């Protein structure tokens, strides 16, 4: 679905201290931006922030960067974090948001700068000629490896079986070991799951969610 342009989105996100306006200038300097040496985790395609806002609240000693393509999406993610701050009466200083095309992500993060990646319900790009746009494709996994620390995990969730099975091959081809996998996350023994907005919706529809953890060898 194409988002309608919202003229007010860019001014609103630029006014937020949780928005990184020039992310390429922070390459190799993200810990300085957060003013600590804590691990940095990414959510690629963070959407409206339902998932990452829960992580930020739960793990104050981990820094998070949420990335999405459109200002019109990130503006709601920033609002979601603000709502969470008001709810718990605590300011979150461990979160930044970026609007960018993930294809250029290696220009934003430096070697060994990132400790974990979350990819939730990304576009499955079912047409073969578009497969390289998948966030789990070998082309992008190769880019991620440029800035991931050794033994880094990528957590991947989807409702699309074809994407899930293709992604297993992408991870293996790219030097990752799949350490956990389930085709029915909500009926599995995995206890660390945090639900996204899409996931909650899919659950009410009776759809099965697939999940894997892949570790960089």
UniProtKB/Swiss-Prot annotation:
It comes from the Bacteria. Keywords: Methyltransferase, S-adenosyl-L-methionine, Transferase, tRNA processing. Residues 129-134 are annotated as: Interaction with RNA. S-adenosyl-L-methionine binds at residues 43, 68, 101, 123. It is an enzyme of class 2 (transferase). One of its GO terms (cellular component) is tRNA methyltransferase complex. GO terms for molecular function: tRNA (guanine(46)-N7)-methyltransferase activity. Its EC number is 2.1.1.33. It catalyses: guanosine(46) in tRNA + S-adenosyl-L-methionine = N(7)-methylguanosine(46) in tRNA + S-adenosyl-L-homocysteine. Pathway: tRNA modification; N(7)-methylguanine-tRNA biosynthesis. Gene3D superfamilies: Vaccinia Virus protein VP39 (3.40.50.150). Pfam families: Methyltransf_4. Belongs to the class I-like SAM-binding methyltransferase superfamily. TrmB family. NCBIfam families: PRK00121.2-2 (NF001080), tRNA (guanosine(46)-N7)-methyltransferase TrmB (TIGR00091). Catalyzes the formation of N(7)-methylguanine at position 46 (m7G46) in tRNA. HAMAP family: tRNA_methyltr_TrmB. This is tRNA (guanine-N(7)-)-methyltransferase. The lineage of its organism: Bacteria, Bacillati, Bacillota, Clostridia, Eubacteriales.
